[in-house]
Amino acid sequence: MTVATAQARTAPQPLAYLKDLVLLSKPRLSGLVMITCAGGMWLAPGQIGAARAVLTVLATAVVVGAANALNCYLERDIDARMRRTRDRPLPAGRVDPFVALGLGIAAPAFAIPILSLAANGLTALLALVALLTYVLVYTPMKQRSATALFVGAVPGAIPPLMGWTSVTGGVDAGGLALFGLLFAWQLPHFLAISLYLREDYQRGGLRMFASVHGERATRLWMALTTILLLPASLALVPLGLAGTGYAITAAVLGLALSAYAISGIGREGGRWARTFFLGTLVHLTVLFVALFLSR
């Protein structure tokens, strides 16, 4: 086999390389952010033009994708030690780390001004706060403290508030209720992840909640935060953001998830936590469908 043939076989194919660049943005997470941002717009009082709405949602996704790319850059050595992440583009060597760094810096420099023009300055500022909190605070904090759980929930809860402020131009009770709902939802969701991936996180040297506080304490916190999620989801009703159908749906979902969380306090092993994690995804999906239908 000639050198040229070997190089041809090992050279990255354009479509595969493009796919890896997209993977840096963690597209499933970015897609969820687009949905929650659009949900904030849908629920907000007032109107925003279709073109401005599309630009706002897309620019929000770009900022989130950039934050994820920077996270991949900063955690590339950690990802290489973890089974779940070692095949990501950077630890696998398919993308140069400085490409991820460049995209992570250039993309928000382009998208945040667009948010300011398509929506308003407040929405752009919220995007910047989410980006900086995720990259400069949450990402390094995961290596030092389990309280990173609560810090990381802040940027994750900002997108629906951005959708709200893009329409209203201000932060009020409705926007804060949406922020509170997403903040509360993330706590049991990520506690479950820290539990069923505890060994992998320990392998990577990350001080996630279950790795630091142990399995029983994590299950207790999962039950507590799931119970607190119920009033957070129902808070939208007295504010006039949702009707009776949503209230019934939120109550049933919240009680069912709380019962399952409580049932896991005395259990052991990661299978239950994995099932609970999937349950939180179903919970949020059905909740947002009910929200959309209630308007």
Swiss-Prot record:
Pathway: Porphyrin-containing compound metabolism; heme O biosynthesis; heme O from protoheme: step 1/1. Pfam families: UbiA. It catalyses: heme b + (2E,6E)-farnesyl diphosphate + H2O = Fe(II)-heme o + diphosphate. Coiled coil: none annotated. GO terms for biological process: heme O biosynthetic process. InterPro entries: Protohaem_IX_farnesylTrfase, UbiA_prenyltransferase, UbiA_prenylTrfase_CS, UbiA_sf. Its main location: membrane. Keywords: Cell inner membrane, Cell membrane, Heme biosynthesis, Membrane, Transferase, Transmembrane, Transmembrane helix. It is found in: Cell inner membrane. Carbon 2 of the heme B porphyrin ring is defined according to the Fischer nomenclature. Belongs to the UbiA prenyltransferase family. Protoheme IX farnesyltransferase subfamily. This is Protoheme IX farnesyltransferase. It comes from Anaeromyxobacter dehalogenans (strain 2CP-C). The lineage of its organism: Bacteria, Pseudomonadati, Myxococcota, Myxococcia, Myxococcales.
